Amino acid sequence: AYDRFMAGGLIHNLRLPARPFQFVLAPMYSFKTQSAVGTGMLAYHIFPRQYFQRISLALHGNSFHHDQSDLNLSKPLYLRHQKLAPSVQFVFKPSSARSTVQNSLMLKYYYIGEEAFRYQRDLTDSLIRPKIISGDEQHLGRLVFLHQNKRTLNPYSYNLDIQANQQFLKIGLTAELRIDYHMPERAFYVRAFGGKFFEFDPNQSSFSIQNQYLTATYTGNNDWIYDGVYLDRNAQSGWKTQQIAMQEGGLKIRTLMYASPLGRSDNWLASVNLRSDLPFSFPLKLQLFFDAATFANAAQLNPSGNKVLFDGGIQLNMFKERLVVYLPLLMSKDFKDYSKSVYAKNRMLQNMSFALRFHPFEWMDQQKEWLQLLQ
């Protein structure tokens, strides 16, 4: 978001059949920040004869800007981050050539380097101005096991995601099931999530890792490892803050103006997300959705005393669900009270949210789709 309009190129060697060595590089120039930015990935694939269908060694990196300040300045300053993430993925051989089951295990390490602002008084005019300094370096180890059954009817998947560093351990289990109706291209979708968070040093400031906590509604400030594409990661108001992601709790309503948003937990969180195709044809790809979540000490943390947060409404899917717009029509009391206290008008529009499912370098398992987009 802070880099705004960017121009650059896309350099890649993607083709079918896949080559052992593949790369995608996207160097760009940001006209807003007047600096070079970009992202890219290198990968080398090994195809063993036994046990594994594929072993992929990859390195993903990017550098963009994630915040700005123009306090008492004629020209704003922008904070940059750098990310390096080497990984190895093991795709296990199926039991037979006709098997619809696929299992994979990924090990990944993240290095995140961020700049930060230090605000200090300028002795020349006694005004407080920001200064860019080197911020904290973040490290994360991640293990993801994914099981998929891509059968024609009622396919399902589940994944175990374990994240850890010197400050915390977070474990998440997500399961998804599509129940096909007896109608073409009509189905009922079920997603369930359960997560547990362990904090290694309870005496440290919770502010330093609050974005790593489990959350019912996943927004840009929760994506501290910069895996997703967000239009604004740090703002608390404006239409860009209406962007969410279908991660962790999967709820659709944001409460960013609270010091501690509803549904944030440093202990455990569980949720279920339901959506259904409409039984009749419609020019737009509309679905109905309903979400519910509960978490540790919910009755004490929710202002209403209720143990469950929920929302439901209509969603519009566009571009093969790469852009999804959510319109909540019903919600739990805590969400209603937040909406009344924060939004003076246009509450229905303010409660709307959208998700961008755009991960440019998840192409190792989706190469046919990305080749179509690149042509």
Which role does the model predict for each range below?
Residues 316-322, 345-375:
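Outer-membrane beta-barrel "beta-signal"
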Residues 21-25, 53-59, 99-107, 156-160, ...:
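Transmembrane beta-strands of outer-membrane beta-barrel proteins
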Residues 300, 304-341:
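C-terminal structured domain segments
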Residues 1-53, 91-101, 117-154, 261-272, ...:
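Outer-membrane beta-barrel initiation region
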Residues 1-4, 13-15, 27-33, 44-46, ...:
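Transmembrane beta-strands of outer-membrane beta-barrel pores
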Residues 74-80, 120-127, 206-213, 303-308, ...:
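Flexible, surface-exposed loop regions and adjacent strand-edge segments
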Residues 38, 54-77, 84-90, 129-278, ...:
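C-terminal outer-membrane beta-barrel translocator/porin domains of Gram-negative envelope proteins
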Residues 265-268, 279-282, 306-310, 317-319, ...:
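A structural signal for short secondary-structure junctions
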